[in-house]
Amino acid sequence: MNNKKLSLTLPLVGILALTACNQPKEEIDPLSQLREKGECLDCNLAGADLREFNLENARLNRSDLSGANLSGVNLRRALLDRANLTGANLSETDLTEAALTEANLAGADLSGANLERSFLRDVDLTGANLKGANLAWANLTAANLTDVDLEEAEFWETTMPDGSRR
């Protein structure tokens, strides 16, 4: 008798488990996720106003932040590898020790930004504004600096796109 109950119960448990696995995941608002967890990987934050956020140590790899307003935001040690920051406002932003490897910063405003010790390897900075930015000890290996405004930018032991130091 116990074997019959067991043989009827096991398939039922399997069906319930499969049903639970196939339930759609609840969509989480990217801004809430970023605020609560300090990360939002592969998120669409295009055009978002993030000026009120503290994003120190945030993880935003592969996220779309094109046209976002990050002016004055703390992004110290943030991970932004392969992020799309095209046309984003990053003026006066603290990006000290941030990782932006292979990020797209074409047309971004980085005027007055602190990029000290940041990793900008293979970054597209085409047409970006880096006027007055601090690039001390930054790594710009293989970065695209076409039409970049570097007026009054600070360099100290900065690794330039060709591997030289400035």
Swiss-Prot record:
Domain Pentapeptide repeat span(s) in chain numbering:
38-77, 78-117, 118-157
Q: Which cysteines are joined by disulfide bonds?
A: none
Q: Which residues cross the membrane?
A: none
Domain of life, source organism? Bacteria
- Give the matching InterPro entries: 5peptide_repeat (IPR001646)
What Pfam families has UniProt attached to this entry?
Pentapeptide (PF00805)
Instruction: Give the UniProt keywords, A-Z.
Output: Repeat
The protein in question is named Uncharacterized protein slr0516
The record lists the organism as Synechocystis sp. (strain ATCC 27184 / PCC 6803 / Kazusa)
